[in-house]
Amino acid sequence: MARPRRASTMQLGLFLAALLLLTPSPAGSVAAAKGGGAKSGGGGTVIGIDLGTTYSCVGVYRNGHVEIIANDQGNRITPSWVAFTDGGERLIGEAAKNQAAANPERTIYDAKRLIGRQFSDAEVQRDMKLLPFAVVDRNGKPHVRVEVKDGDVRVFSPEEVSAMVLTRMKETAEAYLGEKVTRAVVTVPAYFNDAQRQATKDAGVIAGLTVDRIINEPTAAAIAYGIDKKGAEKNVLVFDLGGGTFDVSILAIDNGVFEVLATNGDTHLGGEDFDQRLMDHFVKVIRRKHGRDITGDARALGKLRRECERAKRALSNQHQVRVEVESLFDGVDLSEPLSRARFEELNSDLFKKTMVPVRKAMADARLSKGDIDEIVLVGGSTRIPKVQQLLKDYFGGKEPNRGVNPDEAVAYGAAVQASIISGHVDENTESMILLDVAPLTLGLETAGGVMAKLIPRNTVVPTKKTQVFTTYKDKQTTVTIQVFEGERSMTRDNRLLGRFDLAGIAPAPRGAPQIEVTFEVDANGILSVLAADKATGRSEKITISGDDRKISQEEIDRMVREAEEFAEEDRRHREQVDARNSLEAYVYNIKNTLGGKMADAMEGEEKDKVEEAVREAYEWLDGNPDAGKEEYEEKLRELEDVCNPVMSAVYQRSGGGGGGAPEDGNVDDEDDHDEL
């Protein structure tokens, strides 16, 4: 059954924002009508590119439908491989992959597993041991060192390698269209972080492309599935298992409106990992049968990798294959049987691992298994029978929809989005609205290290959220805005994205200034933060770029996992901070009272008693920064027992006036804001 669409004022605003974003300009519509393709008024055709870990694909929306463009070899998908020969020739695509076994050290692949990451990332360190080419550290980021021709050694960033693949996609489109292409929509895994998205955009720039939009791969695939679907709302789960990454997204599709309800994934899980399990297995077989360890022989490993990939593909249609490599090493041939059952056993834990993001996405979307109307399979690895069976079993025997090409669906959706962005609409796309989401919670640090969450994970983007904060100390003229990403309630457990200062605040008592902080996430998932002093109008802004959001997928998974495992710990920390803040606020209010008109109405003994209690409370707070929740609460009760009777008596003697505090000693402030 269809899930009711989330309805709220914020949702309506997001819907209208997306509508405005995607509504074509009149100029764009005219240009498109004349050319019949995805053109804008002067910008040329906009293409859609699926930049994959192992294969890439390019498409264009023309004459009412998407055309997936074949490369010069006649293939509609192109290997994301780059190589350099002895003569200095650069090879891209099939030509690079076909010579890899003979030239492993100078053949580069899996750049998508390096892009936007830190050299120190655990995944990068693991991959380095498996890759035949050299991965080196440059300013904390992984780069590829390769001999481009005899004696000429070059170092390339992952962005540069990806740009080479994008260039080939661009050239493929130009050859087909007969015109120069300068604009594109490029897809990324839904769980790519900001640094990886920014790096992908940079790769486009290097390739001579303006990347008009970064779009999530499963969302693009959902467009491919739903572009011609009319009628009642459907909840669709997109299961995207490719060569190197894995995403799960759940969308509500209703007459051209594509609303992402939840997304989850693993940016380091895919067909390459299944190949590696086969590699490890046969390396052990060779060691046992021939007494030879080939892990240091890059050429032998290259030959074995190619055969393992072929065997994996064949086992999707056959129950047994033979893995054969002539002259694997020293004239020794490899010829070993491999059954589908053995392949499934070797990868059992990885296959089961794909179900974890499914369960998490379902929970975040607040859907039951019966609420899912369609399951869409995307990515070549979804052809593996065991993966299909696990998914089918999870959904009680529900058969996946096989109506989209798993290799081409992502590029298909990107091409549709490219057409809309360019201003070209027709009866298929005129009502299409895309509402995607932010994968992680965004917020800032408030007093006590508490995370104030402004944009929760799975919030529809583009989005903007404004909240008012105040100062923590008297006469505070500067506040530091520290921006974090993560699911924990304490900022120390989340990822710092960036920080900046807002200076020039007029000196005032603690709690008086009003600092308006605005978080804005654009359609590409890029975050901007603006802080402004409402009194003076002074403001500062920061855009969280790739250099600020260096966060690995392992860290993302850790954040969410720890948030689930340590929810109780988070609750205790938050309660502790709240209890301390309550005590501090009470002490501060009493201190203010002692300096105001009410103090004149106090008798000498009363004033001395309250002043002594406040002084002792200040000293106790200074000496007990890490006290427990119960200790703070007990100290507050002790202080109230001393101060409240005095305040009440004075308040009554003054006839309820005199600007005093209410009976509990707290000032009623309708502008009660979290403190920075």
UniProtKB/Swiss-Prot annotation:
One of its GO terms (cellular component) is endoplasmic reticulum lumen. It is found in: Endoplasmic reticulum. The keyword ATP-binding applies. One of its GO terms (biological process) is protein refolding. Residues 665-676 have a biased composition (Acidic residues). Residues 1-27 form the signal peptide. A motif (Prevents secretion from ER) lies at residues 673-676. SUPFAM superfamilies: Actin-like ATPase domain (SSF53067), Heat shock protein 70kD (HSP70), C-terminal subdomain (SSF100934), Heat shock protein 70kD (HSP70), peptide-binding domain (SSF100920). The keyword Endoplasmic reticulum applies. One of its GO terms (molecular function) is protein folding chaperone. Pfam families: HSP70 (PF00012). Keywords: ATP-binding, Chaperone, Endoplasmic reticulum, Nucleotide-binding, Signal, Stress response. Induction: By dithiothreitol-induced endoplasmic reticulum (ER) stress response. Induced by tunicamycin-induced ER stress response. Transmembrane segments: none annotated. Residues 650-676 are annotated as: Disordered. Interacts with ERDJ3A. Belongs to the heat shock protein 70 family. Functions as a chaperone during endoplasmic reticulum (ER) stress response. PANTHER family: HEAT SHOCK PROTEIN 70KDA (PTHR19375). This is Heat shock 70 kDa protein BIP5. The gene is BIP5.
